[in-house]
Amino acid sequence: MYEIWLIGIAAGAGAAFGLAGAGAFARFDRAPLLAAAVALVAGALVGWLVFDWKAGVAGGVVGALSGLGAGTFARGAVRRGGTPGGTALLLVGAGLVAFVLSFIPIVGFLEGIAIPVLALRARQRGGEKYAGLRTLAK
């Protein structure tokens, strides 16, 4: 059980690198790919150097998945008028929170699943417009 906990911490570190990488590359069109590549390498290296090769694999896989997912959010936020600096600040903060939460057993693995699933869901709904107060203007 201890080894699974350590692998979960490495997975959480990969998720944190994915979120931070997405924030760093938010202004670029290829933000998801750049964030995934950086998080893959960083998550794998940290997991392997701090723990062992199994943790390195988990950190790399979760880093790539979260980089793709968070990069989709970051690119969409900047495209809709958010500032790249503000987006980066929010995503780096989210990465720190994700890393701290990964010390809870199994949460690091759940982060690796939740971030890409939420990004896929947001991407499917990307064309919809929220009516908001426009419904009252009729």
Language model features with spans:
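Alpha-helical transmembrane segments and their membrane-interface exit regions
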Residues: 18, 63-72, 114-126
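Hydrophobic alpha-helical transmembrane segments
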Residues: 21-27, 44-52, 96-103
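N-terminal signal-anchor/start-transfer transmembrane helix
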Residues: 3-27
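Transmembrane alpha-helix boundary signature
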Residues: 47-57, 76-82
